[in-house]
Amino acid sequence: LSKIKNETAGGFLSSLASGIIPLPHQLHVLNRAMETNNIRYILADEVGLGKTIEAGMIIRELKSRGLVSRILVVCPTGLVTQWASEMQEKFHEKFQVILPSDYDTIRRLTDNDDVYGQFDQVISPMDSIKPIEKHAGWSEEKVEKYNEERIYSIINSGWDLVIMDGAHRVAGSAGEVARYKLGNLLAQASPYLLLL
């Protein structure tokens, strides 16, 4: 453990979290990601090899360097709790989870329409924020209002880092695919981007 900490101490400002003993490939990913000033990086390890840990290490390093403070994680619904608990337990990073059912409640309780702008670190499920084309019983105006409130408010919240877990799910054969639109909008929403 001390050898790993000594090897990483030379080039990194963040210290390793007490519960983290990074594997060599995770240190390699951290090194590669931090080689450039414009981090737009794909973490494409196999399932179970610790992409969330790699992302957490990159978050810690970017925060230590003062490069990010507002972070958005968008992931499949089934991974929201895992992301929140791993960031808290392993990196001591508290993220606000915003589920679809929370949106109106937060807006009412805070009397603030900028739901996502109220929190510096947010985790939200991908399918709950993707743009919709139509909805049964809704007029075009209501669909547009929904998209503006949910999707465009998250896109325009001034994120420093956007992390998309399940990025392979945004691929589509046409630019009209809702997840593709979401991925494209999120990729433009911040200077730093991690795709998992």
PLM region descriptions:
Residues 1-4:
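Interdomain "pre-motor" coupling segment immediately N-terminal to P-loop NTPase/helicase cores
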Residues 182-189:
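Conserved P-loop NTPase catalytic core
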Residues 7-25, 31, 38, 52-54, ...:
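SF2 helicase/translocase NTPase motor core
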Residues 43, 73, 196:
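Hydrophobic anchor at the beta1->P-loop junction of P-loop NTPases
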Residues 189-196:
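Conserved helicase ATPase motor motifs in RecA-like P-loop NTPase domains
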Residues 47:
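The conserved Walker
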